[in-house]
């Protein structure tokens, strides 16, 4: 009783095809496919834009900070 057999699924599919019609089901399938395709393209665009947004910082070793400059001038 837990899972349905293949015959149960075939009967359900036939009933759905009779209720909605094959043309309507084809339109739903193509809409779903285009939505998945658009989602995948959006994910590719988002991952391609991510490295461009990151700013690289360079560290210079001999720079002084204001606190260090103030301490040097007081000494």
From Swiss-Prot:
Q: Enumerate the InterPro entries for this protein.
A: TatA/B/E, TatA/E
Cystine pairings recorded for this chain? none
Q: Name one GO molecular function term.
A: protein transmembrane transporter activity
Task: Quote a single Gene Ontology cellular component term.
Answer: TAT protein transport complex
Which portions of the sequence form the region Disordered?
Answer: 45-75
Q: Which Gene3D superfamilies match?
A: 1.20.5.3310
> Where do the TM regions start and end?
1-21
Biological process according to GO: protein transport by the Tat complex
A matching Pfam family? TatA_B_E
Its membrane topology, per UniProt?
Answer: Single-pass membrane protein
Please state where this protein is localized. Cell inner membrane
Assembly: The Tat system comprises two distinct complexes: a TatABC complex, containing multiple copies of TatA, TatB and TatC subunits, and a separate TatA complex, containing only TatA subunits. Substrates initially bind to the TatABC complex, which probably triggers association of the separate TatA complex to form the active translocon.
Q: Family, per the entry?
A: Belongs to the TatA/E family.
Protein's recorded name: Sec-independent protein translocase protein TatA
State the organism's lineage. Bacteria, Pseudomonadati, Pseudomonadota, Betaproteobacteria, Burkholderiales
| Gene name of the encoded protein | tatA
């Amino acid at each position: 009783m837990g899972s349905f057999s293949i015959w149960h699924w075939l009967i359900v599919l036939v009933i759905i095809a009779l209720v909605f019609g094959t043309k309507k089901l084809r339109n739903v399938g193509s809409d779903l496919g285009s939505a998945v395709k658009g989602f995948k393209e959006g994910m590719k665009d988002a991952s391609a834009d991510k490295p461009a947004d990151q700013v690289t910082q360079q560290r210079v070793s001999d720079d002084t900070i204001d606190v260090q400059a103030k301490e040097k001038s007081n000494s």
